């Protein structure tokens, strides 16, 4: 078992190295999973009943699409909006992923080290508990800092093409939201976002740190496969646990004066987290709270694997480079 695999994340690299590695990991991960992200958002914004054909027919009559699954949704978007439609919102999304990952890893490292110092050598928290708290703090901090970019990413992914576009550019979108909705418009849905991020990141980092060392000696056919497997497993567990709140966040993000102008024309008006959950459960059934879960897991697992694999490799390269310069 290598030292790199037995060390915990909080003990590796300087703050600058962590920020650079995190930003690089976020940038690469976003580009890889962009089409799946657009598909997930489109599926999450559908509001027709999954079991009622009449509801689906009504959606078609209103001019909105009815998406059935990951691959068919991807084909539909590519056919109707061009292949670039699968990368809608990529500019704010890239900025989001780069900033989010940099803040996330830096905060995780700082929070874990702070917990270690506060507890003292004699009263250390269990490693899993320390990882949960530090991961949750990292998730809440990075979500809050980057939330306006997340909202912009969702709105761009939800809009149509050509004359059906709600926003013509990122600059125009920022100006329109500021004019029509004020600064609060950039933070629509932040309640469920933070509500799902706290347990998600806590579960993810606790599971990842717990699996990282045991899987280190596992023989896999590709370099770094143990890290990828640990992150994919952790991501699947965490995402499934908090998915309804992720869906609620998306629904609330497209509220406001542009609500009826996106690809899905019939998005209801939602007021708050709990009333949104209640409305979705009543009108779409319990399954409605898990729309897009499959593609979310398909997206989340490789995204987490790419992020953690890239982060650890870039960080290791930066540490090696720094050591070489000092020698």
Curated annotation (Swiss-Prot):
One of its GO terms (biological process) is transmembrane transport. It comes from the Eukaryota. It is found in: Mitochondrion inner membrane. It is a multi-pass membrane protein. SUPFAM superfamilies: Mitochondrial carrier. The keyword Cytoplasm does not apply. The chain crosses the membrane at residues 16-36, 95-111, 132-152, 189-209, 223-245, 292-309. Solcar repeats lie at residues 13-114, 126-214, 222-317. Belongs to the mitochondrial carrier (TC 2.A.29) family. Mitochondrial transporter that mediates uptake of thiamine pyrophosphate (ThPP) into mitochondria. This is Mitochondrial thiamine pyrophosphate carrier 1. It comes from Pyricularia oryzae (strain 70-15 / ATCC MYA-4617 / FGSC 8958) (Rice blast fungus). The lineage of its organism: Eukaryota, Fungi, Dikarya, Ascomycota, Pezizomycotina. The gene is TPC1.
């Amino acid at each position: 078992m290598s030292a790199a695999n037995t060390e915990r994340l909080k003990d590796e690299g300087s703050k600058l190295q962590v920020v650079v590695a995190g930003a690089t990991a976020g940038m690469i991960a976003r580009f890889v999973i962009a089409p799946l992200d657009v598909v997930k958002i489109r599926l999450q914004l559908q509001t027709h009943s999954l079991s009622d054909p009449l509801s689906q027919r009504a959606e078609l009559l209103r001019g909105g699409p009815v998406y059935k699954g990951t691959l068919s949704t991807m084909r539909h978007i590519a056919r109707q909006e061009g292949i670039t439609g699968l990368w809608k919102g990529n500019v704010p999304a890239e900025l989001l992923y780069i900033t989010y990952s940099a803040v996330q890893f830096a905060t995780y490292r700082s929070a874990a080290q702070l917990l270690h110092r506060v507890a003292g050598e004699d009263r250390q928290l269990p490693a899993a508990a320390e990882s949960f708290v530090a991961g949750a703090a990292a998730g809440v901090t990075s979500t809050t800092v980057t939330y306006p970019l997340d909202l912009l990413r969702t709105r761009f992914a939800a809009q149509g093409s050509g004359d059906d576009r709600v926003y013509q550019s990122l600059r125009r979108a920022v100006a329109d939201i500021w004019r029509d909705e004020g600064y609060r418009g950039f933070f629509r849905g932040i309640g469920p976002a933070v509500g799902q991020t706290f347990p998600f990141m806590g579960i993810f980092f606790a599971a990842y740190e717990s699996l990282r060392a045991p899987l280190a000696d596992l023989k896999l056919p590709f370099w770094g496969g143990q890290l990828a497997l640990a992150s994919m497993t952790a991501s699947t567990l965490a995402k499934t646990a908090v998915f309804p709140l992720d869906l609620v966040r998306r629904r609330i993000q497209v509220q406001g004066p542009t609500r009826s102008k996106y690809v899905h024309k019939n998005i209801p008006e939602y007021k708050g987290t709990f009333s949104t959950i209640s409305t979705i459960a009543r009108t779409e059934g319990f399954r409605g709270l898990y729309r897009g879960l499959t593609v979310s897991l398909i997206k989340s697992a490789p995204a987490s694997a790419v992020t953690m694999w890239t982060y650890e490799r870039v960080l290791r390269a930066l540490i090696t480079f720094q050591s070489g310069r000092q020698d």
